[in-house]
């Protein structure tokens, strides 16, 4: 069932929702980011991953500086309509450190 952007609950977390980014082919979790309404609209319009930077308080496109873009193939919405999954085809590493994903440290 396709959802509309108006159905996403951006207000629960102050105008943003968490976005889990997964590789479309392997389903490996690549990163966790945040989206506001505008970045979600840009993602749907361009087919590339756009997010809201909480630390810089601005929109950013994944790969705009590094070239490691993410082609978004599907966007999933959770049952509470307050979290998203982007299924992507990455053109390079997801992490700014150069690692394939941002989850390369273990606690257990």
Swiss-Prot record:
Entry keyword annotation includes Nucleotide-binding: no
Gene3D superfamilies: Phosphoribosyl-AMP cyclohydrolase
Annotated metabolic or biological route of this protein: Amino-acid biosynthesis; L-histidine biosynthesis; L-histidine from 5-phospho-alpha-D-ribose 1-diphosphate: step 3/9
Note on how the cofactor is bound: Binds 1 Mg(2+) ion per subunit.
Catalysed reaction equations from the record: 1-(5-phospho-beta-D-ribosyl)-5'-AMP + H2O = 1-(5-phospho-beta-D-ribosyl)-5-[(5-phospho-beta-D-ribosylamino)methylideneamino]imidazole-4-carboxamide
Binding sites annotated in the UniProt record for Mg(2+): 78, 80, 82
Enzyme superclass (EC): hydrolase
Entry's localization field: Cytoplasm
GO molecular function, one term: zinc ion binding
Positions of Zn(2+) binding: 79, 95, 102
PANTHER family registered for this protein in UniProt: HISTIDINE BIOSYNTHESIS BIFUNCTIONAL PROTEIN, HISTIDINE BIOSYNTHESIS BIFUNCTIONAL PROTEIN HIS7
Record-stated family: Belongs to the PRA-CH family.
The protein's assembly and partners: Homodimer.
Role summary: Catalyzes the hydrolysis of the adenine ring of phosphoribosyl-AMP.
The protein, known as: Phosphoribosyl-AMP cyclohydrolase
UniProt source species: Cenarchaeum symbiosum (strain A)
Higher taxonomy: Archaea, Nitrososphaerota, Candidatus Cenarchaeales, Candidatus Cenarchaeaceae, Candidatus Cenarchaeum
Gene: hisI
């Amino acid at each position: 069932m396709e959802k509309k952007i108006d159905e996403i609950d951006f207000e629960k977390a102050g105008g943003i929702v968490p976005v889990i980014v997964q590789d479309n082919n392997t389903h490996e979790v690549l990163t966790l980011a945040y989206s506001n309404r505008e970045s979600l609209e840009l993602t749907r319009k361009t087919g590339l991953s756009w997010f809201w930077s909480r630390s810089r308080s601005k929109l950013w496109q994944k790969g705009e500086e590094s070239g490691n873009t993410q082609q978004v193939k599907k966007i999933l919405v959770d049952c509470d309509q307050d979290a998203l999954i982007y299924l992507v085809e990455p053109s390079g590493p997801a992490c700014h450190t150069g690692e394939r994903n941002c989850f390369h440290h273990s606690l257990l």
